Amino acid sequence: MSNIDVAAIVFTDDTGRVLCVRKRTSPRFQLPGGKPEGDETKVHTAIRETREEIGIDVDAEQLSYLGTFTAKASNEPGHTVTSTVFLHVGVPTDPAPDAEIAEAAWIDPADHTGVEL
């Protein structure tokens, strides 16, 4: 099984909801983030992808390492995805999804009924 490396950022609001995005090519919501370009660091990958996907500029000092997680890739059969995830300090304002993102939503991780993750 081939592996895909990605980096992502967790944004939470004051009620504990998590900001997630849904790409136009997928029914599932996920954290904003994506694949590295060249020899880009994980932090810089997460920052660039977040800016590209939802228009939020993040400073590296606002991030702390949350962990690295591996799971089956949801939209690439025969692959696993290893996500290096960072936690953002503070609540971002006005995410603006770009062309590849169908929607951005604040999702309660304890009650995500009707939302495919």
Model-inferred region functions:
Residues 4, 69-95, 105:
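Active-site-adjacent beta-strand/loop module that shapes the phosphate/pyrophosphate-binding cleft
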Residues 13, 23, 73-75:
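Acidic surface patches and DE-rich sequence motifs
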Residues 11-12, 20, 87-88, 106:
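Conserved hydrophobic "DFG−1" position in protein kinase catalytic cores
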Residues 30, 64, 85-87, 116:
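Conserved beta-strand segments that form the floor/walls of ligand-binding pockets within enzyme
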Residues 31-66:
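The catalytic Nudix box helix
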Residues 1-18, 35:
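Conserved N-terminal beta-strand and adjoining loop/helix that marks the start
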Residues 24-29, 94-117:
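Nudix hydrolase/Nudix homology domain
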Residues 7, 34, 48, 89, ...:
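Structural detector for helix-capping/boundary residues
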